[in-house]
A protein has these predicted regions:
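Non-catalytic terminal accessory segments
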Residues: 1-67
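Extended recognition/assembly regions associated with phosphoester-bond processing machinery
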Residues: 11-15, 21, 53-56, 73-75, ...
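Alpha-helical transmembrane signal-anchor/signal-peptide segments
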Residues: 63-78
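Membrane-embedded segments
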Residues: 75, 79-182
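Beta-strand-turn-beta hairpins that frame and shape the catalytic cleft
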Residues: 75-89, 181-182, 189-201, 221-223, ...
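Active-site metal-binding loops of divalent metal-dependent hydrolases
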Residues: 92-95, 125-127, 162-163, 187-188, ...
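Binuclear metal-dependent hydrolase catalytic cores centered on His/Asp/Glu-rich metal-binding motifs
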Residues: 174-187, 193-230, 234-238, 300-301
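Conserved beta-sheet core of the metallophosphoesterase superfamily
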Residues: 178, 233-309, 314
Length: 314
């Protein structure tokens, strides 16, 4: 992680040097005798690097260290009235060992989630970070021991992501389950709430596991209400008609959302279609959280790390 800060500081120092040179050029000559168009050019040449400097500083040092709780409501046709108002805490892509994702941040995740008093907590994969120039591997037992303090009357359920399987999916699963978190890998679980019930269906990660979407959903009794969980939202088009809602993560919201451009890089074969937030398509609802950590580059810009409290209504 130290290398990530060295990299970011090197960029900032380069921008500062460039800005200094521009300011020197900006002040050369008799300002009163310079044509107006040249004044505009010089001013722009000074201001633009300053804006870039601020954006880089924010993206590497400020925004990745933020964490917000975001409230979302999804209205689903034919959602059972007895399940109206179900509140699910959605957490994804923690990536322990990445920039700013340490014991203190894990404690903050737990505290902020518990303050919201959700009915159910779902963890959508990628608890691990690789050993790289900007992150270091933290054993899954560390993350799981922190997450065991999550509190919800209906329990805490999880799926695994590609980074978990690239490390050791079996070890990550054992760590979570040893700390009271049930992992659903092409498995289902019935949740009873108030006077009704619904089923969670955990779908295996798309990038690293064989796909058995229809077979997994078929484990749920016919006519039952289903909330599907997975790491990668690209499975969304493959959902059977009986699944009204899929919760996913993986994309990090693109990590960088540039004004007028959007998200240049999204790890999805559908481009930016499933980048983040709520989408309704072909009778199904999809919700994708932007997650908490980072990967590839230790940067977030206009994509704030989040915990989502999702309320489902009929």
């Amino acid at each position: 992680m130290r290398a990530a800060f060295v990299f970011a500081i090197a960029i900032l120092l380069g921008l500062l040097l460039f800005l200094f040179q521009q300011l020197r050029w900006f002040g050369r000559g008799d300002w009163r005798s310079i044509p107006r168009w040249q004044k505009c050019v010089r001013a722009s040449a000074a201001v633009i690097p300053l804006l870039i400097f601020g954006a880089v500083f924010w993206g590497f040092f400020i925004e990745p260290n933020r964490l917000v709780v975001r409230q979302e409501t999804i209205q689903i046709d034919n959602w059972p009235p007895e399940l109206n108002g179900l509140r699910i805490a959605v957490i994804g892509d923690i990536h322990t060992g990445g920039p700013f994702i340490n014991d203190r941040k894990l404690k903050q995740i737990v505290e902020l989630t518990n303050q919201q008093q959700p009915d159910l907590v779902v963890l959508l994969g990628d608890y691990m970070s690789p050993d790289s120039w900007h992150s270091h591997r933290v054993e899954p037992e560390v993350t799981a021991a922190a997450l065991k303090n999550l509190q919800a009357p209906l329990g805490v359920y999880a799926v695994l992501g590609n980074h978990d399987w690239w490390y050791n999916g079996g070890k990550v699963r054992r760590a979570l389950e040893d700390n009271g978190i049930r992992v659903l890998d092409d498995e289902v679980a019935e949740i009873k709430w108030r006077n009704g019930s619904f089923w969670l269906a955990g779908l295996a990660d798309l990038w690293t596991r064989p796909q058995h979407v229809k077979e997994t959903i078929a484990k749920v009794p016919r006519g039952a209400t289903i909330v599907a969980l997975t790491h990668n939202p690209d499975v969304f088009p493959d959902l059977p008609a009986s699944v009204p809602l899929l919760l996913a993560a993986h994309t990090h919201g693109g990590q960088v959302n540039l004004p007028l451009i959007g998200t240049p890089i999204v790890p999805s074969r559908f481009g930016s279609k499933y980048t983040a937030g709520h989408l309704f398509e072909n009778g199904h609802h999809l919700f994708v959280t932007t997650g908490i950590g980072t990967s590839i580059l230790p940067v977030r810009f206009r994509v704030t790390p989040e915990i989502v409290i999702l309320t489902i209504k009929f």
